[in-house]
Amino acid sequence: MKKNFLNLLFTTALMLSANYSFAQYPNIPADVKKASDSMLKEAYHQSDIAWEKAKPIIAKEAGEGKPYIPWAGRPNDLPQSKLLAFPGAEGGGAYSFGGHGGRVIVVKNLNDSGPGSLRDACEQGGARIVVFNVAGIIRLKTPLIIRAPYITIAGQTAPGDGVCVAGESVWLNTHDVIVRFMRFRRGETFVGRRDDAIGGNPVGNIMIDHVSASWGLDENMSMYRHMYNDSTGKTEEKLGTVNITIQNSIFSEALDYWNHAFGSTLGGENCAFVRNLWADNGARNPSIGWNGIFNFANNVVFNWNNRSTDGGDYTAQYNIINNFYKPGPVTELKDPISYRILKPESGRSKLPYVVFGRAYVAGNIIDGNEKVTKNNWDGGVQLEDKKGNLMSYEQASKYFAAMKAKDPFPMPKISIIPTLQAKDYVLANAGATLPKRDPVDTRVVKQVSTGKIEVHPDAKPSAFQFEHRRLPGDSYKQGIITEVSQVGGYPEYKGTPYKDSDDDGMPDAYELKNGLNPKDASDASKITKSGYSNIEVYLNSVVPVSIVKPN
C-alpha cells in the first residue's frame, strides 16, 4: 500500500511539473530522484555486505580451478566447460559452467530476502545450483544483483505453476550463468526506476534458455556489454559480453508508460540469439548494441511500431538468417517499417560520409510481403543518411555491393531450420514452458498466431499520459500496453511443495526411482559417468531435448 501511494505521489508530482524534457525521456523531479537514489544506495550497500561474505569462497574456488574474471572482454578470456551446459545447449554460451559441481541451494519461500529466498541463494559465493520448492510470485523490493560467478538457476524444478519474479530488475553482473525456465515480469511504472526486467552487466559464459521476460520499463532484457572498474581510479572500461546464448525465450509487452516499450538490446562477442519471440514491443526487436558478429537466426518478431531489428555500427557484421517477421495491429503497413528486416547504423563513424557494416541477410520472411520475402535485400535492409533520414531503396541500394556478404560470417554452432518450421517451433516451445506455460505467454503466443490482440474487459488508458508518447492512450488495443492491468495483471502461480527429505533439491520420489538415497544430501553433488552431477541429471531429465533444440 505504501509503495502504491508513493508511486501515485511521484506520478502526480511529475504531472504538475512544468519542466518536461522534449526528448523521449521524462524529466524526473528532484524528490523522486532522491527517493530512487536512496533506494539504490541501500540496495548496493546490502549487495556489498553479501559480496564481502561471498569473497572468501570465491577466492577458495578460484584456487581450485574456477577463477573469477570480471575483466573478460574476449571469448577466450573465459575458460569454458568440456560439458554442454545441458543437452541441447547451443551457441556461444553452450559451454558455460553455470553452477556445475557446486552445492545445491533450495528456494523455499517467496520473500524478497532472507534465508530460503531467491535473493539469498543468488548472493552467496561459490558454484551453486539454485532450485525451487515453492510456487508463486517473488516480489522484489530492490534490484537482485548477482555478482558471484558460477550459478545455475533452474526454474523447471518449481512445483505446480512455477515461479515469477516481479517488481524489480534482476542484474547478472558476473560470468558463468545458466538461467532456465524462469519468468521475469517486472510490471512497475515508477519513473525513478525505469529499468529492464532482466539485464545488468553480464560478463560472459551466459546461457539463457526458456526464459519469459515482460513488462519492463526500459527493456525486457539487455545483454551485450559490461562496465569493468579495476579499482585503480581509471575510467570504467566498456567491454563486450562474451560467449552468450539466448535461446527459446519470449520477450513481450514492454511497458510504454514512459514512451519506452522496448524489447531488447543484444550483442557481444561469440553470441547467438536463436529461436526466440519478440512480441508487442514498440521498438528494439532487438536493437544491436555491439560491433562484433551479431548472430540472429530462427527468431519470430511480431507487432512492432517504430523499430524492428536495428543497430550496431559501421564495423559490425550481421548474420540475419531465417527469421519470421509478422506485422501486427500497431505496425503501419503503408510504411517501410512494416517490412524492415535490418537497419544497420553508421552514426558512430566520424567520417563525413555514411558507411555501414557488412551483412548476410537471407531466408527471412515478412508475413504478407512477397517481394521482400523473395529477396530480403529488395526493401528489407534499410539505411539512413547522415541526417538520420531513411533512404529510398534507390539511394540505399548504392551501398549494398559493399555491405552484402555472400556467405554467413563465422558463428558459434547453432541449429538453423527452415523459417516457417522455426516459426512453429518457437510458438510451441519458447518461454518458460516448464513446469507449465503461464496465461501471459499463452495469450501472447495466441496473438502471434491470430494477429488479434486480447485485452482485459475492463482495460482503460492509464490515468497519466506522458506527453511525449508516440502512441495514443488506447494503444493497448493494438498490443502496446502501459500498465499490466490492461492485460489482466499477474496470474496466480500455485503449487504444493514436493517431499524432499534431505533438502538436496531432488524429490524423494525421483531419488527412490533412480537408486539414490532420499536421506543423503551429499549424493546430489556426486558426478555420474555422464560427467554431470546427480542434481544436474535430475534437472536435465525434467526437460525433453526436443523442446530445447529441433531434431
Model regions and ranges:
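Acidic Gly/Asp/Thr-rich repetitive segments characteristic of extracellular carbohydrate-active
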Residues: 86-130
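Predominantly extracellular beta-rich ligand-binding scaffolds that present long acidic/polar faces
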Residues: 295-307, 317-327, 331-366, 371-392
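Extracellular beta-strand-rich, repetitive "passenger/adhesive" scaffolds
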Residues: 156-163, 182, 519-521
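Primarily auto-inhibitory N-terminal propeptides
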Residues: 24-85
